[in-house]
Amino acid sequence: MNINDFMFTLINELNENLFYEVELYKECNKYDKTYLLRVIAKRHNKKYDYGFSIHENWLDSISINEIINFLLMQ
């Protein structure tokens, strides 16, 4: 999946009020898992940690596809 497909999927899954922030993210032209987790948390009006600890090891172990799948399941 390329960045355009990924961002299209993400935009379709997000609330409209996050569209501007996602557009800013697209400008970065990179994958940033921490950013994606913040977006997911905001989407659900939760705290940043979304009920789990964010550690570098955990971020390294999760794939972009897993994050997309998480979004699609919501």
Predicted feature descriptions by range:
Residues 1-26:
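Negatively charged, low-complexity tracts enriched in Asp/Glu with abundant Ser/Thr
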Residues 6-13, 36, 40, 66-70:
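Charge-rich, solvent-exposed alpha-helical interaction surfaces
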